[in-house]
Amino acid sequence: MIVLVQANVLTVGLGDKNEALQELPLRLIAMSSGSEAARSLKNERVDSVISKWDLDDMKNGLFLKRFRAVKPEIPTIVFVKAGDRAQEIAARSSGASAVLTEDTTDEFFQTTVANILGLRGIVSIKTISPAESEKSQYEKIAK
């Protein structure tokens, strides 16, 4: 099966949340720390950045603030702690394209990413084994 990648997305500090994006036509560049992500940006072209607001090595949105200062035109999605209003306000004030809480469902996360990146039509791809079917199953999540 051939899947055409429609966007390069850098994720920072998301851990298991990255799995929710596996069905989208994205090339994921997953990093665990802000400093690691900053170094990777020297060599990688990205269409979007998705990051936790508070990273272990860069607190209070420092990574995203620095990134937005250099590349304000690139869409960013930020994960904040559920119920932390100060963090949410700070993330929204940074100019993020979307602010989600860490308890956001995978389905809503996928839909948000698809909408922000302009992935329209068939964007979620689920393959099943050839023994079950000759074709892949496609799911429409962005309208």
How would you describe each model-predicted region?
Residues 49, 76, 99-100:
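Two-component signal transduction core modules
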Residues 11-32, 36:
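Two-component/phosphorelay signaling modules centered on CheY-like receiver
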Residues 42-44, 67-73, 94:
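Conserved phosphotransfer cores of two-component systems
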Residues 86, 104-113:
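C-terminal output helix
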Residues 47-70, 84:
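Conserved phosphotransfer microenvironments
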Residues 120-143:
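CheY-like receiver
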Residues 32-48, 56:
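Acidic, metal-coordinating helix/loop segments flanking the phosphotransfer/catalytic sites
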Residues 62, 80-99:
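Alpha4 helix (beta4-alpha4-beta5 surface) of REC/receiver domains from two-component response regulators
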